């Protein structure tokens, strides 16, 4: 019976390879694909985009005892990467990813690399046969895999900041003897992120006052709706904006009551800008800080209801129209 089990064990080794322990020297490394360890990106980047490129390479010559045997008795080994952090996730049509220490950022291995997600195992190369001494050698420059830092919609785009992303934690090893440790050298990489917003603020191309009469002007009751629509391409939940109203007329002055004057052929006319259903004037000699002063968050696609009121100027009849009345500048707060 004992001989029977010895024979079965011999057949197992013959069929499935020698699983004897193997020793290795050398190191792997993860380094930036371009010079430097600092990168920047902003909120205009599309979802599921690569922020930066990195390389998995051999930093010191790796020499290992061959840990597997083929049907022909030849000894060989395969280099693997074993992740000790989050297990990998398969991304349909786009390889696999390992989550990083920053939510929404992950390390992506592109398609074509054999992997075993349940074991956190990546195959870094094909079979390499041993020399006459039973050793398998990989030299610097012989192995080179591109990986990418990828951003997805889990990333917090609500504010600008700087942060560090750690490399994939783990080690190199062999395909047969999973106990072999080949050091994986890496570090944290610094990123600066700015939440810029690409925005346009649209409104009527003209505000027409052709129907205004002298009595209307004297009463100060004439007004026109001025609905401004914010169309922004930013990745935050909401965007606080500064609005700076700049009439195209050059001879413009403003007072602390939020009234400004624009001269045209009819004389000096007075306009007051207010929030709809609120008689208080918005100061036009400063930025109109909707997010700070009026507690309004502007979301993409929201309409900002404002009124442009024509008031008493120099007593002359106010006719005509104001074309392209507003130039608007915006910035993230």
From Swiss-Prot:
Transmembrane residue ranges: none
Keywords: Disulfide bond, Fimbrium, Plasmid, Signal
A single GO cellular-component term on record: pilus
Disulfide bonds: none
Principal location listed in the UniProt entry: other
InterPro entries assigned: Adhesion_dom_sf
Modifications made to the protein after synthesis: Three disulfide bonds are present.
Signal peptide: 1-22
Compartments (UniProt record): Fimbrium
Tagged with keyword Nucleus: no
Function of the molecule: Minor component of K99 fimbriae. Is not required for binding of K99 fimbriae to the ganglioside receptor. May play a role in initiation, elongation and flexibility of the fimbriae.
Further information: Requires the FanE protein for its stability.
Name of this protein: Protein FanF
Annotated source species: Escherichia coli
């Amino acid at each position: 019976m004992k001989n029977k089990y010895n024979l079965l064990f011999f057949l197992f080794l013959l069929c499935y390879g020698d699983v004897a322990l193997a020793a290795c020297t050398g190191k792997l490394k993860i380094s930036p694909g371009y010079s430097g360890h600092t990168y920047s990106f902003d909120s205009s980047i599309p979802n599921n985009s690569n922020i930066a490129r990195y390389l998995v390479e051999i930093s010191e010559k790796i020499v290992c005892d061959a840990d597997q045997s083929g049907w022909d008795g030849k000894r060989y080994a395969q280099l693997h990467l074993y992740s000790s952090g989050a297990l990998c996730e398969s991304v349909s049509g786009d390889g696999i990813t390992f989550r990083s220490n920053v939510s929404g950022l992950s390390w992506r291995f592109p398609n074509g690399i054999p992997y075993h997600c349940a074991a956190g195992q990546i195959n870094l190369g094909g079979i390499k046969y041993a020399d006459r001494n039973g050793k398998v050698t990989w030299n610097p420059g012989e192995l080179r895999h591109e990986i990418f830092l990828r951003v997805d919609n889990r990333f917090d785009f609500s504010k600008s900041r700087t942060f560090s992303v750690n490399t994939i934690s783990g080690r190199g090893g062999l395909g047969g003897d999973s106990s072999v440790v080949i050091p994986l050298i890496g570090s944290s990489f610094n990123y600066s992120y700015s939440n810029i917003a690409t925005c346009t603020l649209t409104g009527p191309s003209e505000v027409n006052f052709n129907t205004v009469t002298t009595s209307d002007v004297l009463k100060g009751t004439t007004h026109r709706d001025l609905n401004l629509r914010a169309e922004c391409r930013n990745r935050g939940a909401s965007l606080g904006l500064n609005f700076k109203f700049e009439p195209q007329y050059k001879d413009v002055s403003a007072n602390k009551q939020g009234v400004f004057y624009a001269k045209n052929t009819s004389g000096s006319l007075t306009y007051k800008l207010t929030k709809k259903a609120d008689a208080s004037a918005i100061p036009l000699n400063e930025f109109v800080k909707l997010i700070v002063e009026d507690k309004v968050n502007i979301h993409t696609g929201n309409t900002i209801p404002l009124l442009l009121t024509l008031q008493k100027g120099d007593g002359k009849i106010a006719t005509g129209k104001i074309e392209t009345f507003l130039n608007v500048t915006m910035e993230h707060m």
